[in-house]
Amino acid sequence: MNKVCGLDVHKDSVFACILDEQGKIFFEKRYGTLTPELTKLRDDLVEKGCGRVAMESTSIYWMPIWHVLESDFELTLANPYFIKQLPGRKSDVKDAQWIAECLQKDLIKSSFVVDGVLRQMRQYSRQHRRLTKNLVRLEQQLDNQLQRCNIRFSNYVSNQGSNVSLRKIIKALIAGERDPTKLCALVHGRTQNKHGKQTITDSLDGVIEQVDIQMLIQCMDQIDLIEKQQASCFTHLEELAKEHFAEEISLLCTIPGINKLSAMFILAETGNDMSAFQTANFLVGWIGFRPRNDESAGKIHSRKTLHGNKYLRQIIVEITWSAARSQKSFLGKKYNDLAKRMKSKKALIAIARKILVIIYNVLKTKQPFDHKKNMQAVVDGEEIIEVDTINNIFKIDGEDVMAERRMNLGI
């Protein structure tokens, strides 16, 4: 066995422990986390003949160390939860030494770490979603400010953030307009016809003070700034995706519920190389959609899903809501069928798992998803027969790449 190194990563320090071929401590040292110190760490590991290095995924502090070492060593990123669960550790063993021992005995399963372009795409995609959350918060704050002034127009429109009429009204209020009749003229005719012109006019008759105007100005300035930042993230993300993953995006867009933006988000999290996951079930487990196996003496105690990649989980759930509403796809029909005999959110997770398996096979086979082969055939207008072709849509040289489908209901 070659020499191995375990790194105990902290915010301001890194503890390194190198073990020799016999498992004895060969070298120990504490380093800082500034770039010159990390460079010294790399040089020392090279000088000592270390081949493999392992560290725990401590917050974001492991990332700079990974960037410095990745070109010279075989790196392993370990989940701290799994390291702590391994038996045999003595109380006096240091963290770095224990990590090195586990690495030397091949007891550590490496976490999935993206590199290069995907690393950049991840930052853009996650920032885009953070900005979306901030935007929703500001839109709610804006609505609260209008409600304080007894401007109740938001009660009669949906999707307040992107409502053009509401934006026009706010800009008019900031400009000094107070006449509810003139404000009502800015409202789309469809909204006036639906709720009545007088009702809309009355909803715009409020009591506004100067402090309210200042709060509206600040909210609108922040919203405009976030929208510009969001557009910038989307532009950079689109450029990277178009240059490196144009084919994969077009393939993913053939799946019900997935558009260009969600396809880019998915690729930023999973990448386009599915060899990182042995089967679709490994990808399902990585995201946390695989039910926990909590069964004893034939009695199932829990089927709660596990923890996983929260970013991809949110994206897949949003996609699933979109696909579940469609009655023109196999997924929408399957959701309605499952929702009749279980809670709607449980049915949603079941469909989300199906979509994740489809995504895995689309990226693995480089073949578009043909939802027509999965549609349910209606016979005589009453009896619904599910066309069971989902199992043989994806074949590689005659071998079924979806054998794990039979482990669960459906896909």
Describe the role of every protein-language-model region:
Residues 1-411:
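A detector of single, family-specific signature residues
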